[in-house]
Swiss-Prot record:
Domain of life: Eukaryota
Sequence position, cross-link Glycyl lysine isopeptide (Lys-Gly) (interchain with G-Cter in SUMO): 11
Main location as per UniProt: nucleus
Sorted UniProt keywords: Isopeptide bond, Nucleus, Ubl conjugation, Ubl conjugation pathway
Name by which UniProt lists this protein: Small ubiquitin-related modifier 2
Protein's organism: Xenopus tropicalis
InterPro entries, sorted: Rad60/SUMO-like_dom, Ubiquitin-like_dom, Ubiquitin-like_domsf
Domain Ubiquitin-like positions: 16-95
Entry-linked SUPFAM superfamilies: Ubiquitin-like
Propeptide, residue positions: 94-95
Length: 95
């Protein structure tokens, strides 16, 4: 019997889409399906609209590194089911 599912950990280069999770600080997780060569600003804007947030209020990070709007999943070497973390923008402070 042939197994049609790709093996765990094996990259399928012919698959143009990738499933990404966006995890908020409140524990919420939103899933997106995006093309590997599509700039991540499309995902960022969709997340903000869905959550009722402004792009100015939050920051997106992958593996601890800030994500630029022009970055693509392919450039960041993202794999299927990877998670992007969302953080509230810190403003001000007090002494």
């Amino acid at each position: 019997m042939a197994d049609d599912k790709p093996k765990e950990g094996v990259k399928t280069e012919n698959n143009d889409h990738i499933n990404l999770k966006v995890a908020g600080q409140d524990g919420s997780v939103v899933q997106f399906k995006i093309k590997r060569h599509t700039p991540l600003n499309k995902l960022m804007k969709a997340y903000c609209e869905r959550q009722g947030l402004s792009m100015r209020q939050i920051r997106f990070r992958f593996d601890g590194q800030p994500i630029n709007e022009t970055d693509t999943p392919a450039q960041l070497e993202m794999e299927d089911e990877d998670t992007i973390d969302v953080f509230q923008q810190q403003t001000g402070g007090s002494f």
